[in-house]
Amino acid sequence: MIRTIFTLIAFAVTNLFAQELPRLAAEQLKDEGLKSLGAFKLLQELTSIGPRLSGSAGYEKAVVWGKKKLLDAGCDSVWLQTVLVPHWVRGNVERASVHFGKKNEPLSICALGGSIATPKKGLRAEVIEVSSFEEVHQLGDKARGKIIFFNRPFDVTNVAVGEAYGGAVNQRGNGAIEAAKEGAIAVLVRSMTNAVDDVPHTGMMRYNESVPKIPAAAISTIGANKLSDLLKKEKNVTVEISLECKILPDVQSYNVIGELRGIEKPDEIVLIGAHLDSWDKGTGAHDDGAGVAQCIEAVKLLKQLNLKLTRTVRVVLFANEENGLRGAKAYAERDENKIERHIAAIESDYGGFQPRGFSVKTDSASFEKVKIFSDILSISAADQIRIGGGGADVNELAKFGTVCFELNPDSQRYFDYHHSSNDTIDKVHPRELELGAISLAILSLAIAQNGI
């Protein structure tokens, strides 16, 4: 009887210890992170490399840097995965002006990623403003030979700025296709931002091989407002555009991967990821240098605690998220995925602002299990867990039944900087950035030890 009592006490203490250890460890992760602010130091190094567009020398330097930093963080193994990526070059000429009466004024533009060039002498044509694809198609022959100006702004009443972006971004992505169907010779697209300034925001656009390819450029919000006003007041308004961008052959590049190996279930993977590439405007501090720095810092913090992880925590720094998702697709197609099981994949690709929580892409049964992590995530003030999307890169793993998460920071300022020359490290707060890294570390630890 006494032996039975001692056995029950020992079991209870062991069970309590198993429950308390993650919280105690999470407190330590928070304390160590906020003392060192290591994520910001990593971000300083990464952004000093400069822009990191796929196929560029900057990206290749970032690969070397990322591999070294994962080794320095104490990963048990670090390796590169080969990926074939697109190679688009912006060129040195991005120029536009609006002409009305005997006057002309400059417009602040930049080529959209993937656009073809204009003729060397540029092109000039009348402009027609629209706010939807339906309006383009209603123009019919009136669009032929014209520049179509997409000017649908974000819905400023939407508190979730990412949703407002989602409601406007099809103009950028598919505007050139839809305008070309009606015979347009170029498109201008209002920059994807709420900020009212003279800084254009780039981003990926697409072509359809069955539709003529036409040049595509983003125009700053101030420029868009100016052009819209002129079209209302003046007659025969034309715009002249010059771009010299090029689409070059695909090149070999890499995903950068490192991991802390699990002891009991090493083939069960908890992935934390971000994309290493950035657009060539600014230095990609928030998009997605912040996520890269947070992922490396998260495994560094976990390693410093010298924990025996039940499952493997793996960092993947993805190639080519911005203009193709080639890195994520290549990772999802690995032969090793037949042996390994990714039970969770957590992405940081929404800037380095104050974390609020995580959105989760999963079924309702798994979501109920995931909600229990909100308590431990309150340590880093990231305890708002909701059904939503995972990140663009990790969503490629959803087909395997992986529960996909995305870190959700405060979103109000993200699109002020997104894909623009404003995306630089002076816009990043060291403590906010670190709290994101701590949140990744806490959630990955909780899942590694408890599963889903």
Q: Can you describe what each PLM-predicted range is?
A:
Residues 1-20:
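Bacterial Sec-dependent N-terminal signal peptides
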Residues 180, 186, 190-191, 209, ...:
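Active-site-adjacent substrate-binding region
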Residues 26-33, 48-57, 125-129, 160-176, ...:
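Second-shell loop/turn segments in exported
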Residues 23-25, 99-101, 109-141, 205-285, ...:
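Soluble metallo-hydrolase cores and metallopeptidase-like ectodomains found primarily
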Residues 44, 48-159:
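Noncatalytic luminal/extracellular "stalk/propeptide" segments of secretory-pathway proteins
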Residues 195, 252-255, 278-370, 452:
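Acidic/histidine-rich catalytic neighborhood of metal-dependent amide-processing enzymes
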Residues 21-57, 83, 93, 199-204, ...:
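N-terminal capping segment at the start of a domain
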